[in-house]
Amino acid sequence: MMIGATSETDYELLQVTEGLYRKFNLRRVFFSAFVNVNQDKNLPIKEGEGPPLLREHRLYQADWLLRYYQFEAHEILSKDNPNFNLHFDPKCNWALKHLENFPVEVNRADYHTLLRVPGIGYTSATRIIKARRLGDLNFENLKKMGVVLKRALYFITCNGKMMYQTKVEEDYIARNLLAVKEKLPREVLNMNYRQLSLFDTNTAYSLLK
């Protein structure tokens, strides 16, 4: 799917993506930021211009949420909020906007709920479900299971206690999360327009933990 050649919002692109999965049972949708390589006046943007590569990256992250994290397009974006937050990945942004669902008790939450916690990926969520059958988990256990505690600590409790005394407030959590530098692909950091690898799914997955 070409990104930035026309005026579609991220929400519209994500709706189309969701529709392709549901109606045509596609296994994967790919995105590519539009790059104008000549000065043809019929092209939508000038040579050398193009959408931020971070936008393409956010679409891949949201696509991952649709395919593996049981999200729906309308939960990630909406008509009132049609474009991605450039500061936070889609999963983290969703959590910040739905703090009424947090903190989550990791020793009691079901798999679906764990998937929505920033810092918990589907592998670590599966490990949590299996491990807690043997007893209650603590934060050290979670760290060993691959939970990214520097992100998750604002959204979870272990045996009713948070890792640190912290406020469950959007502004407070957002400020602290901004201090945790997001790991972005080199191409995005450089803000050039070389297309990301269609087969590098590890990067998208790691950023949704």
Which positions does each model-derived feature cover?
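Residue-level signature of tetratricopeptide-repeat
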Residues: 131-132
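Conserved, mostly hydrophobic/aromatic
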Residues: 62, 128
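A glycine-rich phosphate-binding loop feature that marks nucleotide/adenosyl-phosphate handling sites
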Residues: 34-39, 75-90
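Catalytic cores of alpha/beta
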Residues: 6-21
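Conserved strand-turn element in the central/C-terminal portion of the radical SAM core barrel
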Residues: 1-10, 32-37, 45-53
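C-terminal extensions
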Residues: 83-113, 139-209
